[in-house]
Amino acid sequence: MQLCGFNVGLDQRFFLIAGTCSIEGLEMSLDVAGQLKEACAPLGIPLIYKGSFDKANRSSGTSKRGVGLDAGLKILDEVRRQLQLPILTDVHDTSHVAEVASVVDVLQTPAFLCRQTDFIRAVAQSGKPVNIKKGQFLAPWDMKNVIDKARAAAREVGLSEDRFLACERGVSFGYNNLVADMTSLAEMRNSGAPVVFDVTHSVQKPGGLGAVSGGARDMVPVLARAGVAVGVAGLFMETHPKPAEAWSDGPNAVPLKHMRALLETLVALDDVTKKNGFLENNFGA
């Protein structure tokens, strides 16, 4: 699969979707995107910068939601222009799809909306690549139905069916808790779409701090190493210079100063995993 000018697949180095959870202004976005670019470039990691203009799914009605659609798209467009990076953001409503797709390079769907047929059809018919997140309630093999739905919608309007990513972001395991099942990353390959592992949301504790979500930030490197060892096409990780001050999802964000060291480890693992191939593909023979 071609994505933003680079090849994606299990025979390629993983690509990275990274940025702050919520867009926190132009200066912050340029700083984070610039540091991520500097970390990824020497390691040969293709980078897609992400930022959310609206955090529609919040634990509390008083939680900060973001800079809004118009300001957010302007900031993302400026990041792309100044740093020459492809841009991703999430959409939450069919009414926003066309406007957002006119600015960003990749759309992303919230996990909770993965079964909403009209919504999936709208993003699939936008003409842009789409990172489709698996719901926390969904079995990994059911993502094939979601991807097939998106492909059928694209086919109806004469668009390429080879534009969709299947993203794992953890599964609900009791109250206020998510776990990451590593077998899901392999199971989701059967969707026919490249698999992305959203590491930072997989360590989230939804609503775990009462009015806000908690998270186990120290487990991000652990799950990232495990996911890369399984073999994935891409990784998704949110980061922040000062996670404790982040507008959203600070408890599960990677401290920006540690991102380069983490990526160096992950590249080494990725090289070993993909060089040796995937023995599991032969176990059914």
Curated annotation (Swiss-Prot):
Its main location: cytoplasm. It is found in: Cytoplasm. GO terms for biological process: keto-3-deoxy-D-manno-octulosonic acid biosynthetic process. Pfam families: DAHP_synth_1 (PF00793). Pathway: Carbohydrate biosynthesis; 3-deoxy-D-manno-octulosonate biosynthesis; 3-deoxy-D-manno-octulosonate from D-ribulose 5-phosphate: step 2/3; Bacterial outer membrane biogenesis; lipopolysaccharide biosynthesis. Its EC number is 2.5.1.55. InterPro entries: Aldolase_TIM, DAHP1/KDSA, KDO8P_synthase. It catalyses: D-arabinose 5-phosphate + phosphoenolpyruvate + H2O = 3-deoxy-alpha-D-manno-2-octulosonate-8-phosphate + phosphate. The keyword Transferase applies. Gene3D superfamilies: Aldolase class I (3.20.20.70). It is an enzyme of class 2 (transferase). One of its GO terms (molecular function) is 3-deoxy-8-phosphooctulonate synthase activity. One of its GO terms (cellular component) is cytoplasm. The keyword Secreted does not apply. It comes from the Bacteria. Keywords: Cytoplasm, Lipopolysaccharide biosynthesis, Transferase. Belongs to the KdsA family. HAMAP family: KDO8P_synth (MF_00056). This is 2-dehydro-3-deoxyphosphooctonate aldolase.
